[in-house]
Amino acid sequence: MREPAPGAEPVATPPASHWFIYMVRTASGLLYTGISTDPLRRLRQHQSGKGSRALRGKGPLTLAWQQAVGEKGAALRLEYRLKQQSKAFKEQLLTQPERWLACSQSWLATAQTQKRPRYAAAKEGSDNRECQRQVD
């Protein structure tokens, strides 16, 4: 590894496992949720038609929201839970970002205590009330 030139700023090394959860807004106002290590790169892929099929032909796309979540496993669990939420809940998340911390912590804690087979997973919406109570 090369040493930086004298007087040069050291280059920060990104964390080994730094994942983001993000939402992309389509031209018609739909919100798409995904995960990536680089949301801006992923947005460019979606815009070029090389990303998710769900976004192909949906007009101009904008990155509406992104949040660092750490490890890939946590990102996958949070993406799964966020995709289950209503559009109204997601819109509130965009305008009230403090809600994310309460919900993500609750969802990850629930995932740790409820280890169950994938086929047994049911749509879980009851955590929304807990998230709202924690934020209010």
From Swiss-Prot:
Residues 17-92 form the GIY-YIG domain. CDD domains: GIY-YIG_UPF0213 (cd10456). Gene3D superfamilies: GIY-YIG endonuclease. Coiled coil: none annotated. SUPFAM superfamilies: GIY-YIG endonuclease. Pfam families: GIY-YIG (PF01541). Residues 114-136 are annotated as: Disordered. Residues 124-136 have a biased composition (Basic and acidic residues). InterPro entries: GIY-YIG_endonuc (IPR000305), GIY-YIG_endonuc_sf (IPR035901), UPF0213_domain (IPR050190), UPF0213_GIY-YIG_endonuc (IPR022992). Belongs to the UPF0213 family. This is UPF0213 protein AHA_3736. It comes from Aeromonas hydrophila subsp. hydrophila (strain ATCC 7966 / DSM 30187 / BCRC 13018 / CCUG 14551 / JCM 1027 / KCTC 2358 / NCIMB 9240 / NCTC 8049).
